[in-house]
Structures are given as C-alpha cells and as structure tokens.
Amino acid sequence: MQRDKIKVEIKKLSHGKSLPLPCYATMQSAGMDLYAALDDSVILNPLERLLIPTGIVIAIPNGFEGQVRPRSGLAAKHGITVLNSPGTIDSDYRGEVKVCLINLSNQPYEIKRGDRIAQILITPVPEIIWNNIEEFYAKETARNEGGFGSSGR
C-alpha cells in the first residue's frame, strides 16, 4: 500500500551541512531518524538531560505537527530517551529542531556527531471544536471512569 506524501521544506544549518537529512530506516518505518549536529562529542551522565541540536530547520505545513520520539534501541540498550516524549513541533515553529535527551541509566553515555538520537514523525492534527454541555449522555462503556491500571497488569 502506498503512503500519502507531503512536501516539507527543510534547511540545513551550517553545523548540520554534512549530516544526512532525516530519513526512514526501512520502507515501512513510521519515524525518520534525527542526527546529532554536535561539533564535539558530549557525555550524557546518569540522570542528566541535554538539549542536542540537529542542524535543521523545518517548515511543517499547517494542519500537521512534528513529533520527536525516542529511538527504541537507545532506550532499551542504554537508557537514553527523549525527556518530553513525544516532543511537539508546531507548524508555526521556525527554529532549529533540538532534542531533549535524558540518561535514565547508571552509566555515562557519549553522544557523537552524526549519532541517530531520536526520530521524527510528521502527523495530521485536526482542529478541535469543543461542544460544551451540561450533562454527559454518552453511552456507558466497560471501562467508564477506570484508568491508571484499572484494565489489569
């Protein structure tokens, strides 16, 4: 099945010129890898967070958002994840895309120039129109108000 395609303008900043554009690892990947646009390697110590530049500016079309998410391998193997996951990039943001990483392991982790540090998805965002009501007549569900572990372990 062919996926819908949209054009998104992207600009490489001077410190990101030699890095690849965000790209899909496989034909069916949902997210595109983002690369660390660092001049020098940095050490991300346990429980430390750092804002890592990607060297790109993107113009997300109106009606879409960018979602910055962790890479599963970094999280599973090294405890490195995106702190505000998913990080939202609004369609009117025109600054450099940066990734807020945190080290949840007990070992320091070195981030080098060109490392794949996160992934980005460009997803549709509908405009919500709230219908403010006095009484809620929605049909009952099996879950109702259950949350925070109510559906089992």
From Swiss-Prot:
Which of this chain's residues are annotated to bind substrate? R71, S72, G73, N84, T88, I89, D90, K98
Question: Catalyzes what?
Answer: dUTP + H2O = dUMP + diphosphate + H(+)
Q: Offer one example of a GO biological process linked to this entry.
A: dUMP biosynthetic process
EC number of this enzyme: 3.6.1.23
What is its pathway? Answer: Pyrimidine metabolism; dUMP biosynthesis; dUMP from dCTP (dUTP route): step 2/2
Q: Which CDD domains match?
A: trimeric_dUTPase (cd07557)
Cofactor(s) needed for function: Mg(2+)
Instruction: Mention one GO molecular function.
Output: magnesium ion binding
TM spans, by residue? none
The answer to keyword Metal-binding applying to this record is: yes
Top-level taxon of the source organism: Bacteria
Keywords (A to Z) from UniProt: Hydrolase, Magnesium, Metal-binding, Nucleotide metabolism
What function does this protein fulfil? Answer: This enzyme is involved in nucleotide metabolism: it produces dUMP, the immediate precursor of thymidine nucleotides and it decreases the intracellular concentration of dUTP so that uracil cannot be incorporated into DNA.
Q: Which family does it belong to?
A: Belongs to the dUTPase family.
What is the protein's given name?
Deoxyuridine 5'-triphosphate nucleotidohydrolase
Q: Organism, per UniProt?
A: Wolbachia pipientis subsp. Culex pipiens (strain wPip)
Gene name of the encoded protein: dut
